[in-house]
Amino acid sequence: MLLQVILLVSLTAILPCTGQFPLYAIPDKLGPWSPIDIHHLSCPNNLIVEDEGCTSLSGFSYMELKVGFITTIKVSGFTCTGVVTESETYTNFFGYVTTTFKRKHFRPTPESCRKAYNWKIAGDPRYEESLHNPYPDYHWLRTVTTTKESLLIISPSVVDMDPYDKSLHSRMFPKGSCSGASIPSVFCSTNHDYTLWMPEDSNSGMSCDIFTMSKGKKASKGGKVCGFVDERGLYKSLKGACKLKLCGISGLRLLDGSWVSIQNHEEVKWCSPNQLVNIHDFNADEIEHLIVEELIKEREECLDALESIITTKSVSFRRLSHLRKLVPGFGKAYTIINKTLMEADAHYKSVRTWDEIIPSKGCLKVREKCHPPYNGVFFNGIILGPDGQVLIPEMQSSLLHQHTELLESSVIPLIHPLADPSTIFRGDDEAEGFIEVHLPDIQKQVSGIDLGLSEWERYLIIGISAIILFILAIIFTICCRRCKRRKKIRTDHIELDRKVSVTSQSGKSIPSWESYKSRQGHSRS
């Protein structure tokens, strides 16, 4: 504690009377470089303030956030889309079969989606069988429609959960969020009426796996807890803390933005909506000295950069600048050589003006001489620009805009297809490209006799058929009349033959005129 007070007093003594924070701190002694792992990075303890009189220490266990917590929690899930696959077959007069497949959508139920997902992850053969289109049936001169309802599962589908109110956030949700999900029926509607989102684990629902158990020492004074020493040996004060629930667990949000599950017997107010974890909104009366305020802000930026490095598995020169020592004293320096993260022991000194460390173009003054860069890289985020200028991230000048992150993030988050606006379906057939199919029951519909004609062709054939039938009826009528006429003529001839028979003078009947004449000739002779 004495060394900390001496450090703080000496730091205050070297500052101007205006109370401004030192412009920069740079090593005046720099040890050899050695490679380190990304998980060995740490933020320097620039200021440790212990509460006066809190000398009674006792061991205790507490919960804190896991490393990598960045105010949102990744929840793995899947989407379930209801699809109706329809096969339509038509068999013409000659037996030729034409099959047409169509696809429509319907809104599935959460229970059926969970069952389909369990089939998929368990390797159930019923799921494999459901990947096929419905088997088309056919009947002669008929149209047969066969439909199969499908539950299409896409996994994984990762969304963000807000630990403060446990709401889910993703671009696939209407208005970007889903706040109506509850255990045990956890599901969210998406931008498509026929698609639901559900978490992979139905038992845990939307539980938060962001906490870790740690051991520390509680500092108290007269039975009142005023701070604690965490597992890493850093003392944290409860002064200015407020109550905050994360994932339903009560705890305290400390002044530096960290969260612990420690309970304080003193009456503590609830945090305001703008007081979030790792996001600070300090008031002037909460900070006793401007130096302390600046150190806390710089530490938070360092913690944010460290969290970003660990979660993205990516290091940039800009992020390394946050890990440097801010005040005079011993610390660490970092750089990147041959794409390898390097560390060196260093002793920092205070800098009041930039001219002290950049006396000329391209010269970074360290240990009273120009420090040589390695492929344009110095250390702590300081690089050599294309024009030969030394670029320091903290420099408040036009050169700051020229400083870019030379090492991009190597981790690309998995984005669900529905979360990409470019993949929003324009038609029913566009859902086939990236969807896996689960198909339950099959339904068949057999139509009446169908000649496979369009509506206007059908009416045209009906009209022509009517005309042909009318003509055939006329022809049939004419033929019938002619047949009747011929039959009548035959009947008339027979009656005429009967009427022309005569009787001779002898009283005998003569059947015809010729026989009568012949008989008259014989009688005369």
Swiss-Prot record:
It is a single-pass type I membrane protein. Residues 1-19 form the signal peptide. The chain crosses the membrane at residues 460-480. Keywords: Glycoprotein, Lipoprotein, Membrane, Palmitate, Signal, Transmembrane, Transmembrane helix, Viral envelope protein, Virion. Glycosylated and palmitoylated by host. Glycosylation is crucial for glycoprotein export at the cell surface. Belongs to the lyssavirus glycoprotein family. Arg-352 is highly involved in rabies virus pathogenicity. Its mutation dramatically attenuates the virus. Attaches the virus to host cellular receptor, inducing endocytosis of the virion. In the endosome, the acidic pH induces conformational changes in the glycoprotein trimer, which trigger fusion between virus and cell membrane. There is convincing in vitro evidence that the muscular form of the nicotinic acetylcholine receptor (nAChR), the neuronal cell adhesion molecule (NCAM), and the p75 neurotrophin receptor (p75NTR) bind glycoprotein and thereby facilitate rabies virus entry into cells. This is Glycoprotein. Glycans are attached at N338. A lipid is attached at C480 (S-palmitoyl cysteine). Pfam families: PH_Rhabdo_glycop (PF24834), Rhabdo_glycop_CD (PF24833), Rhabdo_glycop_FD (PF00974). It is found in: Virion membrane. Primary surface antigen capable of inducing and reacting with virus-neutralizing antibodies. Almost all human and veterinary vaccines are based on the functional aspects of the G protein. One of its GO terms (cellular component) is membrane. Residues 505-525 are annotated as: Disordered. Residues 20-459 are virion surface. The lineage of its organism: Viruses, Riboviria, Orthornavirae, Negarnaviricota, Haploviricotina. Residues 481-525 are intravirion. Homotrimer. Interacts with matrix protein. It comes from Australian bat lyssavirus (isolate Bat/AUS/1996).
